Regions:
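Active-site entrance/lid segments in N-terminal catalytic domains of soluble metabolic enzymes
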Residues: 1-162
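Residue-level detector of alpha-helix initiation sites
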Residues: 17, 169-170
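Conserved active-site-proximal phosphate/metal-binding subdomains
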Residues: 148-164, 170-309
Length: 309
């Protein structure tokens, strides 16, 4: 895994939010930039994005996120471009990492599997994943249910490889806490939705800046998988947060609709949403996180010194 970085952070790959501008800005600021390949509506666009990212980040690490669910008919084409452009890290989501293993290992890359349970973590390692991204309670988008501290501890009982943890971490102190608990890296998503370089529309960024944790709802009623949605966005799309429907079948294709609305038009956020105060460049966000991270480490060191005095 990449060291040294300014911070042990991945700007999490976010659907319809993470594009080349955000990936490049994150990498240049000293963290790992990532994007989901389905954000590109064509294989030609994906080729263009990867070409640009690779040219602009140089030797800095970056990450492509593949959806390995059986509904992703474009996966073989995406994998062909992964082989061509060789992102150092490939995160697999919504399915087994197995389809990506041979391609990524052939050029020396690392496969990280998104997991939401200990059972899935064990399956991912058995399938050949090099590392795990543990998606915990508090994450935006498709979310988890486990405490990050409990999840880290449970995984570390059988796995000592690279471990990313994500879910509600919105400041540098949270990053330091996750590292102290045993994670190697942290996923941060919601904080970067409002970055100037993200693909999110202005209205989405404004909604984030106005939102608090109470404005979130976890529901499987949109895509069939539990996800954390912004209540104001649900209402804007004609849904009642207090009366959500039963979960449909899996609907990971953004063109699929719910009550006449594309589910991709419903906006999500994680429990760290209250930390978003407005739109900023990614570099400014990273620099603030770094100051907070350093301050948290200093507090821990000072507390230890006091306890030994």
């Amino acid at each position: 895994m990449p060291d040294p970085l300014r911070l042990p952070v991945f700007a999490a790959p976010m659907f319809l939010v993470s594009g080349p501008d955000l990936v490049i800005a994150a990498c240049k600021a000293g963290i790992v930039g990532a994007f989901p390949t389905p954000n590109c509506r064509s294989i030609e666009q994906l080729d263009e994005w990867m070409t640009r990212i690779r040219a602009e980040v140089g030797t800095r690490p970056w990450c492509a996120n593949l959806v390995t669910h059986s509904s992703n008919a474009r996966l073989p084409q995406d994998l062909a471009l992964v082989a061509k452009h060789q992102p150092p890290f490939v995160v697999t989501a919504l399915g087994s990492p197995k389809p990506a293993i041979e391609t990524v290992h052939a050029y020396g890359g690392k496969v990280i599997a998104d997991v939401t349970s200990v059972t899935l973590a064990k399956k991912a390692i058995a399938a050949g994943a090099d590392g795990l991204a543990c998606i915990c309670a508090g994450a935006g988008g498709h979310t988890g249910t486990l405490s990050p501290f409990a999840f880290i501890s449970a995984v570390r009982a059988f796995f000592d490889g690279p471990l990313i943890v994500g879910g509600g971490i919105s400041d540098g102190a949270g990053v330091a806490g996750a590292i102290a608990a045993g994670a190697d890296y942290v996923y941060m998503g919601t904080s970067f939705i409002a970055a100037e370089e993200s693909l999110a529309p202005v209205a989405y960024k404004d909604m984030l800046a106005a939102a608090q944790i109470e404005d979130l709802l976890v529901s499987a009623g949109i895509t069939g998988t539990p996800a954390s949605w912004l209540k104001p966005s649900l209402r804007d799309n004609g849904m009642d947060p207090d009366n959500m429907p039963d979960a449909p079948g899996r609907a990971y294709d953004s063109s699929q609709s719910f009550k006449g609305k594309r589910w991709a038009d419903v906006w999500s956020a994680g429990q760290g949403v209250g930390a978003v105060k407005g739109t900023e460049p990614a570099a400014v966000i990273v620099e603030r996180l770094a100051r907070e991270y350093d301050a948290a480490q200093a507090r821990l060191a000072a507390r230890r010194e006091r306890s030994l005095a």
